[in-house]
């Protein structure tokens, strides 16, 4: 019998891990430079925690039960878990809270495909306790900084505003609103043309479909929709954000007020980070503002503003494979320590430990015996080991540099 991973699961071998760590380390350096601190939440959550924001479909969650028959689920995303942790464990800390994560998530994928991946790796940030222009700009600029740190140049940001889009949909009859929303989300003009709408509402829906492009054109189009004071203020805030982002130089933005995320807890800006180089566009990450989500977990229902984004490690990996930046080999050891005979075993362990205690990271292997000198030298060449330390019983040594 050949034992295989469970359907949808996979193993990461040493080179896979080295490449994944390369990406994660680059992102972590950026998060630290922006003053963010790592949070680690439970892989298992109560189902009521995961479902509180009405953002996650129950059938997506891989469910378990504990001994008390309590419904549990493997987290399909991190924001709900972090929201729970912040309002229950971090209430005495001052805002804003700048948090980042690097974790795996699990989603049940209902497709007729064997071994459809169900475990994913993500990295992202949550900026909690503050709203407004500067907080929005910080998170978007941080996302751009992450891509720059990875050496990615051909990307753009698709920026929408859930509050504006939702309020524009309020003009449609309740019984048709969901269909209009779905048609706009899928850029489905045929459905818009066939729904039983008045001429005025049909034209409004068509305009909403076309609210995508450069910021000047989109903001001009949306302003033609007879906005009320609240809607106009949201448009003005969006314009201020775009101007701030673009004032610092090249920040590739496509404004898209038809952008409707499947996650429904977003209340303000929403965005997707899209790679341009593939023949087919690849979404590298997404995020948005969720000023009412934390209130669902707060004991007194107090709303705490929040905004964040997630980057998909697998999608970043696929793009980076084409750039030749990822490690092509696992790290080589610096030393191979070889006891010349059994009496030298103790001295060999002592010398290897001395090398490992260097202030800098030094990778040291110990030869475990059973081979002759030529085989040991060939092993060192095959493993790209830089030096061999031949250890005698009295602790003296001969250093051999290995020619590759």
From Swiss-Prot:
GO biological process: histidyl-tRNA aminoacylation; L-histidine biosynthetic process
Alphabetical keyword list: Amino-acid biosynthesis, Cytoplasm, Histidine biosynthesis
GO cellular component: cytoplasm
Gene3D superfamilies the record matches: Bira Bifunctional Protein, Domain 2
Signal peptide annotation: none
Chief place of localization: cytoplasm
Pathway terms, separated by semicolons: Amino-acid biosynthesis; L-histidine biosynthesis; L-histidine from 5-phospho-alpha-D-ribose 1-diphosphate: step 1/9
InterPro entries: aa-tRNA-synth_II, aa-tRNA-synth_II/BPL/LPL, HisRS-like_core, HisRS/HisZ, HisZ
Molecular-function GO term, any one: histidine-tRNA ligase activity
Keyword Amino-acid biosynthesis: yes
PANTHER family referenced in this protein's UniProt entry, alphabetically: HISTIDINE--TRNA LIGASE, MITOCHONDRIAL-RELATED, HISTIDYL-TRNA SYNTHETASE
Subunit structure: Heteromultimer composed of HisG and HisZ subunits.
Record's miscellaneous remark: This function is generally fulfilled by the C-terminal part of HisG, which is missing in some bacteria such as this one.
Biological role: Required for the first step of histidine biosynthesis. May allow the feedback regulation of ATP phosphoribosyltransferase activity by histidine.
Membership in a protein family: Belongs to the class-II aminoacyl-tRNA synthetase family. HisZ subfamily.
UniProt name for this protein: ATP phosphoribosyltransferase regulatory subunit
Gene name as annotated: hisZ
């Amino acid at each position: 019998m050949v034992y295989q991973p469970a359907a949808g699961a996979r193993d990461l071998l040493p080179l896979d891990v080295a490449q994944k760590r390369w990406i994660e380390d680059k992102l972590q350096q950026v998060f630290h430079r922006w003053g963010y601190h790592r949070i680690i939440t439970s892989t298992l959550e109560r189902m009521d925690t995961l479902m509180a924001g009405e953002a996650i479909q129950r059938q997506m969650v891989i469910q378990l039960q504990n001994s008390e028959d309590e419904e549990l689920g493997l987290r399909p995303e991190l924001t709900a878990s972090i929201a729970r942790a912040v309002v229950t464990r971090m209430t005495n800390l001052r805002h804003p809270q700048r948090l980042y994560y690097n974790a795996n998530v699990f989603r049940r994928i209902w497709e007729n495909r064997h071994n459809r991946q169900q475990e994913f790796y993500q990295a992202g940030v949550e900026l909690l306790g503050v709203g407004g222009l500067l907080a929005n700009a910080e998170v978007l600029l941080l996302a751009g900084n992450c891509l720059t740190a990875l050496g990615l140049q051909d990307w753009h940001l698709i920026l929408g505003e859930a509050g504006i889009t939702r309020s524009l949909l309020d003009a449609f009859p309740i019984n048709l609103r969901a269909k209009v929303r779905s048609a706009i989300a899928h850029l489905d003009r045929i459905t818009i043309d066939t729904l039983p709408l008045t001429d005025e509402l049909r034209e409004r829906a068509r305009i909403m479909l076309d609210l995508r492009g450069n910021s000047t054109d989109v903001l001009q189009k949306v302003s033609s929709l007879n906005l009320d004071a609240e809607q106009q203020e949201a448009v003005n805030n969006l314009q201020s954000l775009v101007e701030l982002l673009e004032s610092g130089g090249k920040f590739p933005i496509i404004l898209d007020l038809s952008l409707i995320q499947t996650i429904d807890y977003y209340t303000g800006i929403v965005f997707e980070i899209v790679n341009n180089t593939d023949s087919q566009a690849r979404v590298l990450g997404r995020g948005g503002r969720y000023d009412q989500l934390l209130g669902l977990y707060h004991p007194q229902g107090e709303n705490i503003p929040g905004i964040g984004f997630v980057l998909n490690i697998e999608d970043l990996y696929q793009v980076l494979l084409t750039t030749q930046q990822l490690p092509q080999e696992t790290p080589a050891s610096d030393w191979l320590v070889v006891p010349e005979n059994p009496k030298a075993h103790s001295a060999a362990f002592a010398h290897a430990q001395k090398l490992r205690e260097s202030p800098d990271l030094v990778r040291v292997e110990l030869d475990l015996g059973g081979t002759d000198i030529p085989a040991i030298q060939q092993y060192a060449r095959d493993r790209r080991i830089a030096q061999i330390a031949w250890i005698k019983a009295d602790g003296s040594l001969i250093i051999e540099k290995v020619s590759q």
